[in-house]
């Protein structure tokens, strides 16, 4: 009977922990200085033998890297405690966001986080997410790929969806993990009173609330808070808990052991599917996706640079005999991880902290661009050719590509033609040309004075658009600039209002918007590219409209137009000035004393089905939001957008809007959503997609929910504010922290694209079009007159590489999307990661490596799944068929000669 009573008692698992924001309203420097004090106290407490058994260091491996960099003498102490599973770290490197950073960034964060934790002795196999603002629908699959079966979190689930704390979470692909919610947050047990009378009432209240939500006898009671010191007398307090409350059992524990216990006692759990984004009981800040648009844009650009260009080029370079710079790439990623932490990428920081974020982006970009340039140069310098003006063109997608691409070049004065390696003349136009003779030639160094080097009399830095015929899959080709022949590069400029290519005809309407005609179907889309400006009374966490708003539309605004037309592209430039309120006070009075100058460039490239947009804004006003609207004419109940490693359909209206105020939700449920690169509306026979290089935020608006609103930017003046229309009650963050930098005053530039199609979504190839849009062909100019201090001098190399090269390719009928191609972390092979981008149909691919190779399925942590596709073959390997939102990773290992 005694045993039965024990088994019926509530078992309270007291989890000592910290939630350590590496930066927020304070800087990383302050955080790291105080981290040293904190970790020393934790190590001492765990070692003193007074019942302090476990401590959770926020599941962030970066914290120990930070600590041991300054306290290397404690590394062995840490290894001992981590190996004994008493100091719990991992699986993350930093506590990352899951909605606005890329899928690859999340995967690398987990990979390097677990690698770091294992370096110290043990990586916690729990998806521990105490504070991220919502949970991506693809995380169950990602967790399972890393061998993580348990998920412990706070934000995103409300009692109207699941009244209990335990459930099974099913991801978009069908993967499941066992989930436990901390219903009242990670800080719930952070303030324990020590006076006996107060403590007894406290336990009855706090633990009683947890019991009401628990579906087993186990409850999770976290003792910790933001950057709070360890509660040194916690073992003594737990002994007191047991004395004061004999009806319950109190034990100190850590997440892994807790989850193993509670899972054994769990039966018939409900299954929750998809994103966890409910804000009834806790805030998820669902419009933080556009906070500090300037920083979000930098993050996106660098993620694309690393994954879409840098890692593939480094892999090509490695296959050609050059060393793969693993540690440089890791350092770039770790800079991004610091910025991927939920507050950092959220932008909900002080201005000082956000300047640190911006500097890390600068560092990451500088390193990435320079290591990319070095390896393109290593390859180009060994290609068999003797031309003065040879350009190597790199294709980092697994199929041949052609079309118009932009190239940067240093050119002498004079006319020229461009030819490919077959001697075929290529069409081109020069779009920009600036003389830099003194700068370039003044840096030249003659390493070999005996060698005759052509030095032009004048040098111009130029941008060109060149129509390439074919660039090999995952490889390179060359094009030659021939100055002995004459080419016509002129573009005709006029005050016209119309441009076109094979697919579209675009004209400026009388009201200043665009009329787009799809030449294939003859369908006309009127009132496109409408700019909408309105007030933002929110803060760094949430967009919120003012109580008295004024919305300004570009419709009816005077527009000046210029067209530029060449053989390879046509461009339409529009200038306008919106009359807008200067600030929220003027907006509430419906005043419009300020101007918001806009310049929009709309371009069509020969043979391309994309309409490209670039918008320059001179932001002179405060606390507002600017969006660009595309009226699709497709009444939609669902929007379609990409998510990490797949696609997701979301409702365009929410029933919860009717009850949120009555039920006192912490935030208004809204349909402002996140994407990775595109959003689309489709009625089964036609569709429209908007692709972005910048802010990954959209909303579907209009009476028929037929208009895609792409957020360009939003601005605000305080880190936190109280009593917002969309977020009533207390301020998030700190309301006294002013953020004038977040007003984003000055010049801003945004780029995005439009894709119109007469087909269902799956048939339109939107994911591939977006991937190509975000993966431009890359070029390198090898010219002796550039060899010098300008780019660091290079010696002459033996020319042994062919002018055309392909390392790896997918067959023509392959329909997966390449997510990553890189050197494996700890083997001689290459990682190929793909996913199914479709709503309904399955996807597959046939991969062929350039040599005989071994093809093996591996998990996201690059461990073998025990399934070899092909052991040794020159014909490649057929991948298994992938269902909706499934990802697949293949290790391709070349045979040693």
Residue ranges and their predicted role:
Residues 1-49, 189-244, 248-254, 259:
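Terminal accessory/targeting
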Residues 79-82, 136-190:
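Surface-exposed loop and adjacent secondary-structure segments within mature catalytic domains
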Residues 107-138, 145, 205-220:
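CE4/NodB-like, metal-dependent polysaccharide N-deacetylase domain
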Residues 16, 55-66, 144, 155-158, ...:
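C-terminal domain-boundary segment and adjacent tail
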Residues 17, 113, 143, 254, ...:
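Conserved, mostly hydrophobic/aromatic
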């Amino acid at each position: 009977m005694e045993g039965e009573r024990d088994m019926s008692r509530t078992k309270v698992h007291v989890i000592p922990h910290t939630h350590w924001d590496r930066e927020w309203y304070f800087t990383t420097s302050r955080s790291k200085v105080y981290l040293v004090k904190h970790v020393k106290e934790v190590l001492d407490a765990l070692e003193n033998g007074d019942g302090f058994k476990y401590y959770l260091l926020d599941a962030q491996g970066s914290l120990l890297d930070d600590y041991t960099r300054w306290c290397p003498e404690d590394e062995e102490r840490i290894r001992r405690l981590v190996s004994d599973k008493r100091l719990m770290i991992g699986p993350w490197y930093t506590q990352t966001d899951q909605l606005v950073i890329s899928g690859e960034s999340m995967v690398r964060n987990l990979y390097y986080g677990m690698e770091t934790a294992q370096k110290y002795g043990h990586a916690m196999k729990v998806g521990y997410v105490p504070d991220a603002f919502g949970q991506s629908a693809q995380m169950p699959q990602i967790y399972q790929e890393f061998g993580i079966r348990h998920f412990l979190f706070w934000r995103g689930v409300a009692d109207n969806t699941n009244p209990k704390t335990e459930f099974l979470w099913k991801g978009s692909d069908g993967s499941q993990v066992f989930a436990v919610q901390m219903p009242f947050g990670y800080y719930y047990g952070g303030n324990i009173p020590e006076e006996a009378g107060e403590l007894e009432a406290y336990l009855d209240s706090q633990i009683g609330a947890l019991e009401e939500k628990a579906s087993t006898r186990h409850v999770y009671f976290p003792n910790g808070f933001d950057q709070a010191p360890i509660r040194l007398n916690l073992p003594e307090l737990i002994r007191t808990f047991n004395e004061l409350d004999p009806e319950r059992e109190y034990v100190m524990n850590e997440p892994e052991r807790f989850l193993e216990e509670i899972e054994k006692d769990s039966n018939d759990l409900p299954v929750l599917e998809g994103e966890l984004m409910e804000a009834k009981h806790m805030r998820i800040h669902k419009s933080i996706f556009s906070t500090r648009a300037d920083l979000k844009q930098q993050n996106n650009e660098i993620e694309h640079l690393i994954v879409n260009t840098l890692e593939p080029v480094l892999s090509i370079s490695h296959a050609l005999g050059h060393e793969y710079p693993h540690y440089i790439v890791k350092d770039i990623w770790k800079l991004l991880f610091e910025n991927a932490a939920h507050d950092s990428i959220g932008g909900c920081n002080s201005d000082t902290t956000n300047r640190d974020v911006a500097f890390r982006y600068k560092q990451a970009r500088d390193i990435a661009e320079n290591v990319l340039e070095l390896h393109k140069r290593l390859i180009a310098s060994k290609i068999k050719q003797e031309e003065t003006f040879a350009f190597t063109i790199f294709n980092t997608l697994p199929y041949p590509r052609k079309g118009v691409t932009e190239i940067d070049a240093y050119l002498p004065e004079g006319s020229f033609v461009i030819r490919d390696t077959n001697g075929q003349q290529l069409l081109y136009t020069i779009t920009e040309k600036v003389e830099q003779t003194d700068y370039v030639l003044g840096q030249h160094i003659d390493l070999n004075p005996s060698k005759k080097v052509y030095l032009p009399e004048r040098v111009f830095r130029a941008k060109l658009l060149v129509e390439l015929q074919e660039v090999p899959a995952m490889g390179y080709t060359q094009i030659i600039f021939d100055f002995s022949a004459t080419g016509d590069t002129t573009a005709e400029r006029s005050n016209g209002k119309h441009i076109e290519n094979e697919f579209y005809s675009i004209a400026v309407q009388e009201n200043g918007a665009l009329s787009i005609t799809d030449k294939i179907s003859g369908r006309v889309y009127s009132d496109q590219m409408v700019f909408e400006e309105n007030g933002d009374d929110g803060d760094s966490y949430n967009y919120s409209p003012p109580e008295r708003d004024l919305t300004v539309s570009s419709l009816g605004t005077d527009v000046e137009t210029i067209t530029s037309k060449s053989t390879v592209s046509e461009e339409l430039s529009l200038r306008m000035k919106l009359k807008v309120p200067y600030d929220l006070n003027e907006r509430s009075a419906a005043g419009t004393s300020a101007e918001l100058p806009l310049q929009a460039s709309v371009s069509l490239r020969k043979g391309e089905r994309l309409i490209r947009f670039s918008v320059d804004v001179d932001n002179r006003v405060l606390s507002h939001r600017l969006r660009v609207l595309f009226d699709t004419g497709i009444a939609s109940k669902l929007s379609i957008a990409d998510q990490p490693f797949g696609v997701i359909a979301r409702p365009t209206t929410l029933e919860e809007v009717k009850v949120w105020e009555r039920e006192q939700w912490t935030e208004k449920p809204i349909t402002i959503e996140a994407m990775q690169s595109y959003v689309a509306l489709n009625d089964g026979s036609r569709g429209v997609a908007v692709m972005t290089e910048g802010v990954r935020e959209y909303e579907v608006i209009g009476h028929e929910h037929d208009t895609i609103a792409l957020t360009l930017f939003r601005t605000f003046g305080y880190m936190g504010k109280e009593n917002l229309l969309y977020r009533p009650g207390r301020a998030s963050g700190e309301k006294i922290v002013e953020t004038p930098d977040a007003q984003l005053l000055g010049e801003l530039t945004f780029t995005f694209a439009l894709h119109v199609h007469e087909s269902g979504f799956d048939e339109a190839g939107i994911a591939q079009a977006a991937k190509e849009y975000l993966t431009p062909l890359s070029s390198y100019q090898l010219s002796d007159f550039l060899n010098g201090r300008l780019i660091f001098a290079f010696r002459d190399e033996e020319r042994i590489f062919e002018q055309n090269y392909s390392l790896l390719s997918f067959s023509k009928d392959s329909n997966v999307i390449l997510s990553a191609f890189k050197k494996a972390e700890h083997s001689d092979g290459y990682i190929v990661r793909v996913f199914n981008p479709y709503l309904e149909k399955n996807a597959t691919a046939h991969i062929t490596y350039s040599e005989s190779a071994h093809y093996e399925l591996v998990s996201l942590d690059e461990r073998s799944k025990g399934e070899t596709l092909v052991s040794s073959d020159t014909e490649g390997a057929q991948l298994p068929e992938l269902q909706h939102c499934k990802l697949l990773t293949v290790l391709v290992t070349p045979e040693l000669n």
